[in-house]
């Protein structure tokens, strides 16, 4: 098994506490509301929403995938960090065993946030992950993130 790691950074004008509440803690409710074409629904299969919780994410009509299952590996509300692993679903090909994601929000000097994301692709055998596959995923994540940011800017009293 090989592990391929990719890192991404986004910036936002939204401070980390507010962005973490919306983009991480309430994503299961907010994202289907503002981007139903991307995510139709999210449901807890097992657990209470904390570490160890198993969730099924059903994608919207605009997605090339049907659904995925992920497990929450860590939540640190004080340091605005979140990690989970994608463990089942059609986004995992016969070449990928699982994908682990780590996201951390840090304050930027202008009062906003820097969102640092690390993706670890755990492959089956000696398979290599193509850069264009990862780039496409990053572009979708960037678009989704921008939708959340726009929502928060348009609704300044939510997630305070």
From Swiss-Prot:
InterPro entries per UniProt: Bet_v_I/MLP, Bet_v_I_allergen, Plant_def-hormone_signal, START-like_dom_sf
A GO molecular-function annotation: abscisic acid binding
UniProt keyword annotations, A-Z: Allergen, Hydrolase, Nuclease, Pathogenesis-related protein, Phosphoprotein, Plant defense
Post-translational modification: Phosphorylated in vivo. Phosphorylation prevents its activity as ribonuclease.
One GO cellular component term noted in the UniProt record for this chain: nucleus
TM ranges: none
Lineage top rank: taxon: Eukaryota
GO biological process: abscisic acid-activated signaling pathway; defense response
Entry function: Possesses ribonuclease activity in vitro.
Family: Belongs to the BetVI family.
Protein name per Swiss-Prot or TrEMBL: Major strawberry allergen Fra a 1.04
Organism for this UniProt entry: Fragaria ananassa
């Amino acid at each position: 098994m090989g592990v391929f790691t990719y890192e991404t950074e986004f910036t936002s004008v939204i401070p980390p506490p507010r962005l973490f509440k919306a983009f991480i803690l309430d994503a299961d409710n907010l994202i289907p509301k503002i981007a139903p074409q991307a995510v139709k629904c999210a449901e807890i299969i097992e657990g209470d929403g904390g570490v160890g919780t198993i969730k099924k994410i059903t994608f919207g009509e605009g997605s090339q995938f049907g659904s995925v299952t992920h497990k929450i590996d860590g939540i640190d509300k004080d340091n605005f960090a979140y990690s989970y692993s994608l463990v089942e679903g059609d986004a995992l090909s016969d070449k990928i065993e699982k994908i682990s994601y780590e996201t951390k929000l840090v304050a930027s000097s202008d009062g906003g946030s820097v969102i640092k994301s690390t993706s670890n692709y755990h492959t089956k055998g000696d398979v290599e992950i193509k850069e264009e596959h990862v780039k496409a995923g990053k572009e979708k994540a960037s678009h989704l993130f921008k939708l959340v940011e726009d929502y928060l800017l348009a609704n300044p009293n939510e997630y305070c």
